[in-house]
Amino acid sequence: MEVLDTTVDLGTLQGKSALITGGASGIGLATARAWAAAGMYVTIADIQPLETGQNILADLAGGHVHYVCCDVTSWESQITAFKEAIQFTPSKALDIVAAFAGVSFAGGNQVDHVLAAGDPRLDVNPSPPDIRNIQVNLIGVYYTSWLGLYYLRLSPTNKAANPSPDKSLILMGSIGSYMDSPKASTYPASKFGVRGLFRSTRARTRELGVRCNLLAPWFIDTPLIAPMKKAMAARGIDMAQRLTFASVDACVEAATTCAANPQLHGTPPIRYAYCLKT
């Protein structure tokens, strides 16, 4: 098992531009904070209202940070976010796209939901299932990946603003991209899908001059798992006593390594602090 060298020169990020979907909370916000501190032009695209974005911008005052409301399940909304991110940068080009938007673990195996629908009948149609996990975590990431590979090819109008040609696409999977989960269906389906997208895409993104990597964090105590913690608590289980959470800082370090290390691309199995695995 190869160990990831996280020694990176943050100076290489100075002046670069990034779009982070899901950047208003959790790993996305922590990454935006770190990259802004490194001197990057960071656009946060998130479904949270503009007021939330304005509060984030106030908190990150002094950095080059832009906020745009974005529903990642909407193709048009994502195009708007990409165009705003490009216009925000002096180079009028993007260097890094981080597809971090996601919704929390939705419990219930598909079999549970089928049984809950009752005995099969021909005179009544069953209600459609809740597939928001798949819509946001997989389709949304697919849209971001597609548009990232499309817009990352733009040449900077001002090469002096950022002369580096290195481009990076970072996809957000999870431990659910690798681990069986008989207690749920849509969340692991979405995360296995992101892993499949990564494994099929990484072989060819170099043709477009783009590096592609996958983050697959272990459980992290962020707002994303709040519903899971609540459900476990209702059963008398304290997740904090049963699990050792990975840290947000470790995930940010892994994301920054993917962004800054020009040699890191679609690498065979790497494990980094329960956080990065390909």
Swiss-Prot record:
Keyword Iron: no
Reactions this protein catalyses: (1'S,5'S)-5'-hydroxyaverantin + NAD(+) = (S)-5'-oxoaverantin + NADH + H(+); (1'S,5'R)-5'-hydroxyaverantin + NAD(+) = (S)-5'-oxoaverantin + NADH + 2 H(+)
GO molecular function: 5'-hydroxyaverantin dehydrogenase activity; oxidoreductase activity, acting on the CH-OH group of donors, NAD or NADP as acceptor; protein homodimerization activity
Catalytic site positions: Y187 (proton acceptor), K191 (lowers pka of active site tyr)
Subcellular location: Cytoplasm, Cytosol
Originating organism: Aspergillus parasiticus (strain ATCC 56775 / NRRL 5862 / SRRC 143 / SU-1)
N-acetylmethionine PTM positions: M1
Gene name for this UniProt entry: aflH
Residues annotated as binding NADP(+): S25, I27, Q48, D71, Y187, K191, I220, T222
Major site of localization recorded for this protein: cytoplasm
Protein's recorded name: 5'-hydroxyaverantin dehydrogenase
